[in-house]
């Protein structure tokens, strides 16, 4: 029996480059079927809708750009069924499991894990262990340029496309809004601070990768994760996703930096 871990969990915030990593790991065929399993809200069974990211915002110039809320249906599945589904769907035939967790999803994970039998503890680390079924390799992906990350988020939340290219017509309707981007920057910074505080509190030492390094060295990073799982690092593929940012995103980033300097917005 291998002494290597048989699971990994990518820890991140939205638009940090985590999809680039997990899709490359998925492409190996031996590194699980990683999904963002913990994004679904129990009251709707859906991932957060655009307006839910701006729940405390009253500025109508922001809200008018976001799709209205859909009611959804509550997720009534027992905790054990929920756990078993996650373990089954995230695993490749060789037994390796993969997943992705954002900091804003950690309360949901901890809350749902409370109802599992034979808990190993009550905190986040125990919740991860008890839901995944073992102690996974933890990989922390972060993006030092939070302005670019926030612009990417703001554009995606308007188009509802989180990977690949959006519909050109819908993308053309997306609008720059400094206040919305500022809101997202504050949210993303809080998520990253949450991860780093938790690492310190729990003495967790993940594989730590920033987005610029990941983008330039994707095959190497995938190989590192494969090696940690006891898999052949030579299976790491060439990049399978293209960069979503384009000239328009770059223009929004530069425009926001100017607005932030002038108006005292977060950077």
Swiss-Prot record:
Top-rank taxon, per record: Bacteria
Pathway(s) where this gene product acts: Glycolipid metabolism
Coiled-coil intervals, chain numbering: none
Pfam family for this entry, one: Sulphotransf
EC number: 2.8.2.37
Disulfide bonds, paired cysteine numbers: none
Keywords, sorted A to Z: Carbohydrate metabolism, Transferase
Known outcome of mutating residue 33 to A: 4-fold decrease in catalytic efficiency due to a reduction in both trehalose affinity and reaction rate
One term of GO molecular function: transferase activity
Chain residues that bind alpha,alpha-trehalose: 14, 33-39, 48, 53
Catalytic activity field: alpha,alpha-trehalose + 3'-phosphoadenylyl sulfate = 2-O-sulfo-alpha,alpha-trehalose + adenosine 3',5'-bisphosphate + H(+)
UniProt KW Transferase keyword: yes
Active site: 36
NCBIfam families on file: TrhSuTaseStf0
Known partners and oligomeric status: Homodimer.
Similarity comment: Belongs to the Stf0 sulfotransferase family.
Miscellaneous comment text of the record: The reaction catalyzed by Stf0 follows a rapid equilibrium random sequential Bi-Bi mechanism with formation of a ternary complex intermediate.
Reported function: Catalyzes the sulfuryl group transfer from 3'-phosphoadenosine-5'-phosphosulfate (PAPS) to trehalose, leading to trehalose-2-sulfate (T2S). The sulfation of trehalose is the first step in the biosynthesis of sulfolipid-1 (SL-1), a major cell wall glycolipid in pathogenic mycobacteria. Cannot use free glucose and unnatural stereoisomers of trehalose (alpha,beta (neo-trehalose) and beta,beta (iso-trehalose)) as substrates.
Protein name per the record: Trehalose 2-sulfotransferase
Native organism: Mycolicibacterium smegmatis (strain ATCC 700084 / mc(2)155)
């Amino acid at each position: 029996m291998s002494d290597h871990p048989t699971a990994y969990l990518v820890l991140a915030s939205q638009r940090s480059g985590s999809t680039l990593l997990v899709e490359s790991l998925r492409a190996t065929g031996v590194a699980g079927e990683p999904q963002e399993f913990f994004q679904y809200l129990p009251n709707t069974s859906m991932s957060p809708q655009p307006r839910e990211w701006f729940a405390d915002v009253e500025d109508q110039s922001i809200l008018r750009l976001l799709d209205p809320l859909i009611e959804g249906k509550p997720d009534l599945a027992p905790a054990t069924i929920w756990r078993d589904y996650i373990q089954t769907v995230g695993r490749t035939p060789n037994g390796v499991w993969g997943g992705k967790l954002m900091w804003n999803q950690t309360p949901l994970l901890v809350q749902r894990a409370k109802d599992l039998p034979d808990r190993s503890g009550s905190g986040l680390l125990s919740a991860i262990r008890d839901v995944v079924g073992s102690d996974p390799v933890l990989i922390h992906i972060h993006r030092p340029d939070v302005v670019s990350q926030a612009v990417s988020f703001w554009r995606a939340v308007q188009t509802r496309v989180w990977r690949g290219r959006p519909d050109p017509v819908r993308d053309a309707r997306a609008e720059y809004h400094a206040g919305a981007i500022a809101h997202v920057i504050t949210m993303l910074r809080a998520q990253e601070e949450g991860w780093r505080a938790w690492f310190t509190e729990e003495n967790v030492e993940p594989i730590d990768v920033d987005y610029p390094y990941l983008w330039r060295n994707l095959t190497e990073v995938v190989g590192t994760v494969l090696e940690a799982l006891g898999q052949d690092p030579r299976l790491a593929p060439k990049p399978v996703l293209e960069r979503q940012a384009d000239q328009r995103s770059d223009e929004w980033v530069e425009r926001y930096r100017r607005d932030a300097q002038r108006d005292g917005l977060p950077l």
